[in-house]
């Protein structure tokens, strides 16, 4: 039997010319790119997590010479957000890459799993916004579509 998975998302070409994204958040994302520790990949990534209260938690990728020991920006931000606000829902996760010549980068598999489980914990989806520094953006209502067959343990 054949099955089909459909992914719904919005695209924004040259997002700087739209008023869709908060200037405060996009400026913060750009500023944070400078604080990423990416000496091995030279690929800075920043993330801002907006909680339902409006609180903003930030993160950047932090690479390590023992490659699996580094962390991606979105994982840093999401885990810090849930540690600081364990009973508050995440409203939006923004991820910006410093690379301006390509489409926005999608989260890696480990980050998709963490984002998905975070949504399950709070029982409601959050918006995921992927931006590159100068051009395009992708917006998803929830992360389930990015990881349709997530890993879960029996409860």
Residue ranges and their predicted role:
Residues 1-35, 85-155:
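C-terminal binding/interaction regions
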Residues 37-39:
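Short Gly/Pro-enriched turn/cap motifs at secondary-structure boundaries
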Residues 42-51:
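Short beta-strand scaffold segments in enzyme catalytic cores
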Residues 51-54, 132-134:
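Short acidic-glycine loop/turn motifs at beta-strand connectors
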Residues 53-64, 91-96:
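Glycine/charged-rich beta-loop-alpha catalytic/anionic-binding loops adjacent to active sites
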Residues 61-73:
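Compact, glycine-rich, soluble single-domain proteins
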Residues 72, 80-89:
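Active-site- and interface-proximal helix/loop "cap" or "latch" segments in soluble metabolic
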């Amino acid at each position: 039997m054949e099955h089909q998975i459909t992914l719904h998302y919005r695209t924004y070409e040259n997002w700087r010319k739209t008023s869709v994204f908060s200037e405060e958040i996009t400026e913060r994302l750009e500023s944070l790119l400078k604080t990423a520790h990416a000496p091995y990949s030279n690929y800075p990534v920043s993330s801002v997590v907006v909680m339902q209260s409006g609180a903003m938690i930030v993160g950047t990728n932090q690479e390590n010479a023992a490659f699996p020991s580094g962390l991606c920006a979105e994982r840093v931000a999401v885990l810090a957000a849930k540690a600081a606000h364990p009973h508050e829902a995440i409203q939006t996760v923004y991820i910006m890459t410093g690379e301006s010549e390509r489409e926005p980068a999608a989260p890696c598999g480990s980050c998709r799993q963490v984002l998905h489980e975070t949504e399950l914990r709070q029982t409601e989806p959050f918006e995921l916004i992927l931006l590159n520094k100068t051009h395009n953006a992708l917006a998803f209502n929830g992360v389930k579509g990015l990881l349709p067959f997530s890993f879960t343990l029996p409860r």
